[in-house]
Amino acid sequence: MSKISIIVPCYNEEECIELYYNEMQKIVEQLETEFEYIFVNDGSKDKTLSIMRSLAQKDPNVKYVSFSRNFGKEAAMYAGLKAATGDYVGLMDVDLQDPPHLLLEMYNGIVNEGYDCVASRRTTRKGEPPIRSFFARRFYKLINKISDANITDGARDYRLMTRTMVDAILSLEEKDRFSKGIFGWVGFNIKWLEYENVDRVAGTTKWSFKKLWKYAIGGIQDFSTAPLAISKFMSIMTFLGFLGLIASIFICEWTNTFYNFNVLFLSSMLCLMTSIICACLGVMSSYLRKIYKESKNRPVFIVGETNTIVK
């Protein structure tokens, strides 16, 4: 009999875990397959870990991995993928914003329709702040234009994948991970299920605008070198502009033209060019930071406690 592993990252989700488990059990009963939960505690400060322990004592199909500190959702998903033993592996959020009933369609899509992955995307962003929705849409359009990653607008991490696809994802051992980009980069035959946005069942989101901005910038850096090309172009244009302004000084001197205004103009242009150069250096230094981080070869996460095996 085949087996499904569902990875559930958790960070301060004490209000959601049992609600999620109870809803999922209704779905599990309809699946004619073995099933395991892999809850990943991402350094929570509340009772998340103790609830995981309690569920594991009641249900042998509940596995948990607890980090020594907060490493982020990307690390939690990676740890879950490494711990999963199923023939089919899924990712879900614990707040029930990922409708559990879609798992039945996902399983059918892989087993009966031959897909390697059945993923989900939101058709609406109802309930989100307008500014957040605006930047999210711009991000998807931008990263698809400047990178070789294929990320569907509104794509969620919620998906079910074959073991072959999961092994391909795990073969990419980069430390600073951007899973949405990785899912698209590895390819495979993917079917998309659409649904309208669902509110959290309890608790509050852990994704602030600052975290989302950092996540987006990290994704662009992971899958595109376009910012470096833009920096190079800006540097060349700045240098040409500088040469043009120097030439104008010589022309004014040669023709005895009064140019005090030009001096002020040159000063302002030099300030502008300096700021552009600093911006270019900032872009390049961010890429160097990523290279430095990879070169240290530190683990993506550190396990503090678990009741399963993490490869």
Give short role names for the model-derived ranges.
Residues 1-128:
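Structured catalytic core of nucleotide-sugar glycosyltransferases
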Residues 26, 30, 54, 58, ...:
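Conserved amphipathic alpha-helical interaction elements at protein-protein interfaces in regulatory
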Residues 57, 82, 108, 144, ...:
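Solvent-exposed polar/charged
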Residues 65-69, 73-83, 88, 100-179, ...:
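Acceptor/aglycone-binding surface of glycosyltransferases and processive sugar-polymer synthases
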Residues 180-311:
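Hydrophobic helical membrane-anchoring modules
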